[in-house]
Design a protein with these regions (language model features):
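Sec-dependent bacterial lipoprotein signal peptides
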Residues: 1-22
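Bacterial Sec signal peptide processing site at the extreme N-terminus
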Residues: 16-37
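Short hydrophobic beta-strand segments
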Residues: 31-49, 74
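A structural detector for beta-sheet-dominated domains
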Residues: 44-46, 78-80, 131-133
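Amphipathic alpha-helical segments
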Residues: 47-59
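Short acidic low-complexity segments
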Residues: 61-73
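Surface-exposed short loop/turn segments
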Residues: 73, 78-123, 142-143
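C-terminal/domain-edge helix-coil "capping" segments
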Residues: 108-112, 121-164
């Protein structure tokens, strides 16, 4: 009985610490950004299972209206795998674990997102650095908006508008 209670306690502590994170988009202006421009109808030319994350980010960006019919689309989009770059190490986690999550830490990561816009045999290569950081803090356990793809979509929308 004691062993079972120790195992359950360890599982509860691990799940508590694994749920204390959230994502933030930088710069702050991108967080509330809304696309008011007319959207083009787009067709993704390479929808594979290995690119599900990238396609979800592109759909979350609200840049295009996606069609499953290639003849109805104004442009075709070829998506490339996202490249993740971690600019910080995990040493800050030690301080957070010692203080039981009361001191927040932030991992500032840069993700390189690239795709091609193909319109009538003219291909335009788009490549953006998405600045999405992960914050680990005890009180983020009560934040339920923890979807990385939506946050990366906001960052993509901001970068796309600023770098047309």
């Amino acid at each position: 009985m004691r062993i079972l209670s120790k195992i359950l306690f360890c599982i509860a502590i691990m799940s508590l610490f694994s749920s204390c994170y959230t994502y933030k988009v930088f710069p702050k202006e991108y967080r509330k950004l809304v696309n008011n421009e007319p959207k083009k109808v787009a067709f993704i030319s390479n929808p594979t299972d290995s690119l599900k994350k990238e396609i979800s980010i592109l759909q979350s960006s609200d840049l295009f209206i996606f069609s499953k019919d290639s003849t109805a689309a104004e442009i075709k989009i070829k998506v490339y795998p996202i490249k993740e770059g971690r600019r910080s190490c995990g040493q800050g986690t030690i301080l957070t674990m010692i203080t039981i999550g009361q001191v927040p830490i932030r991992f500032s990561d840069i993700y390189t997102f690239s795709f091609d816009e193909i319109k009538k045999d003219v291909s335009v290569k788009r490549k953006y650095d998405l600045k999405v950081s992960q914050r680990i803090w005890f009180w983020d356990m009560f934040v339920f908006n923890k979807n990385f793809n939506k946050k990366a979509g906001k960052a993509l929308l901001g970068e796309y508008k600023n770098n047309k």
